[in-house]
Amino acid sequence: MKVLKVKVPATTANLGAGFDTLGLALTLYNEFIVEEHDGVVIETEPKNEFLEIPENNLFIQVIKYACERRGKTFHGAKLKQINRVPVARGLGSSATAIVGAIVVSSAVSKTELTDDIFFDIAYRFEPHPDNLIPAWKGGFITALKDREKTYYNSIDFPEDIKAVVVIPEFELSTEKARSVLPERIPLRDGIFNVQRVSLFLSALQNRRYDLLRVAMEDRFHQPYRKKLIPNFDRVVQNGYDAGALGVSLSGAGSAILALADRNFEEIGKAMTEGFSEAGIRSEYKILDIDREGANLEILE
């Protein structure tokens, strides 16, 4: 009987002005080890009793739905889920489960995983291609969904830039983070963001790292979401003072992303100190860019 292991990277989306558009895969991974089984048995590492209930486990729900979409009956699975991507921090933890389950279901059914099949299943659980695609394909992508069609493209990302991700102890759900956003954006703010996301992509392409600070400014979401994150401005400023090239929320938060080409430890420590001033514990991770995406192995 085959045992399959899929390793799926965390993602960080938006990167400042690229709201619901840009996504980047990081070298932090959740792993899912699956084998056929009569009924569902789930083991989690670290132990998470909530996720060991099949109805609460997103990976199981997705693989069950994927089977149904192919006209198959889901009889069960034995799953070991190794969680390293923190939940509700803006690092795409749900996307890892969705992508992992789709990749495994495609392998089990010996079906080619086309874009149409992938998005048909994935959008049942998450509507954000800027998270889903880098978790699946890896690298740096820009994406949009137009009616029933998804368009995306990969963008070169400099190899000398790392992501310093500062992760506070508190969770921030995507639903709550979206609830504080305005329904309408002034024209001047739309122009502001279009200018900056264009500058951001050009600065990366031409290695003009001196432009990244202004290019990662935003008026679409961060001015509203930062109110949910104590001492946000101080954490960001500490990152810049320590040598960060650009700093922004990671996805919807609560994690904060700093792009840097040096001083990685200093940046991480300075930003965690910013949270400490508000009485909030946090940790930082220094991550490279994952360029492979979801990786499937047959263990036996």
UniProtKB/Swiss-Prot annotation:
GO terms for biological process: threonine biosynthetic process. It is found in: Cytoplasm. This is Homoserine kinase. Catalyzes the ATP-dependent phosphorylation of L-homoserine to L-homoserine phosphate. ATP binds at residues 86-96. Belongs to the GHMP kinase family. Homoserine kinase subfamily. InterPro entries: GHMP_kinase_C_dom, GHMP_kinase_C_sf, GHMP_kinase_N_dom, GHMP_knse_ATP-bd_CS, Homoserine_kinase, Ribosomal_Su5_D2-typ_SF, Ribsml_uS5_D2-typ_fold_subgr. Its EC number is 2.7.1.39. It comes from Persephonella marina (strain DSM 14350 / EX-H1). It catalyses: L-homoserine + ATP = O-phospho-L-homoserine + ADP + H(+).
